[in-house]
């Protein structure tokens, strides 16, 4: 009996390989699109942290001190002063036109007030429509303001006879020694690519799995497919999805080797646990795709739901905004997305270097996704054997 089942699975798998090889859509979704996304997102952020972002200055004081502040601000890695504007209105207009991301405003009399210890005020404006650029330039401008204030205060203390140690102890009584964990380069490609790339692969698996089942109904070949499996829905799905599992796992292996072997992104646990996590993501995504088609039984609705679920995964996985800071309802709903659990495995293994056992809850969650098709197998079998496709 086992040989018979194995033969049926093999014949269905061979049939599926022929369908994949003769239909460009499969090749695009399974090979071309993932490879394009791998290269696109990693080369898009090839330099890591953005540098030399355009900023402007409004210097109404125009003294040696303020010019020194501007030169020092321009020396920051992320900031590049590209223009000096005569007024606040001109600088604001340039920022609204997208010519600059931020500008530094120094009012008239700043140096005189600083030397007289009258607390002059400088202003800096950042365009947070561009979150990354706005945040980085705001950080540079704020740092420069603090350094400028400290420099003036140090000069005043020196003039009053204070030593360097006394002046520094007064200006900075607590010295901060900061160390960035896991991504010390602040590389945005490390931050984003490790989740975006698996997320895109997951989305493509959702849609390919739904389409590959629905296409049987669309071409009215579902009974032929089920007949090759002796009307066993388990054998039919196993044989049909097995070639896709192999291809998608190869693609998952490729992005792991590409990210951690070629680009040398942090992978403190070694690549083998991440390959295992990639296999779990592939199987969980396929199982979820089967579940969606069995739940809705129509290609159009199942594909729409798969697309929606995949896109929302990027926001709710915790990659861009921490789940613990979300609404409690959203925190609970985050567990319904496979990418969330893959992200937790990535953080525990690749970034923190923990053994796989410490990510057991996420591993179990992905395995639970693999059980979803069992809830709709009977319904799916009935649909494939008796329902007629309606365009």
Predicted feature residues:
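Alpha-helical transmembrane segments of integral membrane proteins
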Residues: 25-29, 190-194, 198, 235, ...
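Membrane-spanning alpha-helical segments of multipass transporters and channels
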Residues: 62, 254-258, 266-391
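Hydrophobic alpha-helical segments typical of transmembrane helices
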Residues: 65-69, 209, 221, 291, ...
